Amino acid sequence: MTGRRTLVVTNDFPPRQGGIETFVRAMTDRFPADSVVVYTSAEPGAAAHDAALPYPVVRDPARTLLPVPRVTARAAGLARRHGCDSVWFGAAAPLGLMAGRLRRESGVRRAVATTHGHEVWWARTPGARALLRRIGERTDAVTYLGAATRAPIAAALGPAAARRMVRLAPGVDPEAFAVRPGAREAVRERACDGAQPGTRNRVRERYGLGARPVILCAARLVPRKGQDTLIRALPAVLRSVPDAVLLLTGDGPYARTLRRLAADTGVADAVVLAGGRPHPEMPEHYAAADVFAMPCRTRRGGLEVEGLGIVFLEAAAAGLPVLVGDSGGAPDTVRDGETGHLVDGRDTAAVAERLVALLRDRAAAAAMGEK
């Protein structure tokens, strides 16, 4: 077998949903199909998903890959079988720990590990910090999303590995999310006059949104993402924009808490929890929205941060103004006051104020989305 080939080792791969999964899949798609092999964990619905891809995907029976001897041996075997001379760890921690053995047993000559937000936790936790340093020693390059995550990770890696760090930030295909000028207004007009809705109104039809102003948050349902802050802000939003609705897409352990919070806050009728949606459906969700908001916040004394937030980039590509929480690398996705607003994700009043301004002045909001 000739030519260079890369083994991608990752837990974060569709049909599992999330920003890292989107990032890893998009990066892998950019390899020539005959130059990449993916080794990833089991996931419901994976067989149909993988069959449609132009490159091989090998699923481990485990739901989570860990750098244990069995997994490392299988990765080494795949690298030998497919003639891989490089390995890319889609998330550095913890899988990058297998880089040394992969080199010894498979002929892999180059190893690259990508960091996101959770490696900041590793960098600031003593035991995990030592393991992160080991990953830096065993790989040729560790990538980072932006300055906010680089600083703590570089300090943990040590001087030599820090000098080899390379920025690798996600991007999106603007054409995949572009909304035709005037399409949102046309959708709202059709909903008002009862005419048959067009293609971009299917999301509004599905959730019974009609012509209501829609605040969209697309994220895993966990406290860091700030869906609870959006729900707490809704009473103030509804006093100024009575027909507004909050559309939450995503799965996660916080779903039951959010439903209860919406009921206790008296805004259950204005909150739609849509569950996880396949990524190919997301352009229509963005097209159905008027504002995108994810007031993410740093938690656990700085251990838990937002790495970047690819959803902010997708929303911007769809022409939406974005409301961004000031956690980790998320501020890199917005020009405050130009393409949206940067807020303290813990400040419910500030979140409500910015949402009201965006929903009431649609011309200004649309101008932000166009920048």
Please give the residue ranges for each predicted region:
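Nucleotide-activated donor-binding/catalytic signature segment of Leloir-type glycosyltransferases, i.e.
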Residues: 256-281, 291
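Acidic donor-binding loop of glycosyltransferase active sites
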Residues: 276, 287-305, 320
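Carbohydrate-associated surface elements
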Residues: 148, 171
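Conserved donor-binding/catalytic core segment of Leloir-type glycosyltransferases
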Residues: 143, 185, 189-190, 209-225, ...
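Short His-centered aromatic/hydrophobic patch
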Residues: 89-95
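Short hydrophobic beta-strand element within catalytic cores of glycosyltransferases
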Residues: 293, 312, 317, 321-324, ...
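Conserved acidic donor-binding segment of nucleotide-sugar-dependent glycosyltransferases
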Residues: 326, 333-337, 341-349, 356-363
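A short, well-ordered alpha-helix in the C-terminal region of glycosyltransferases
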Residues: 243, 270, 350, 357, ...
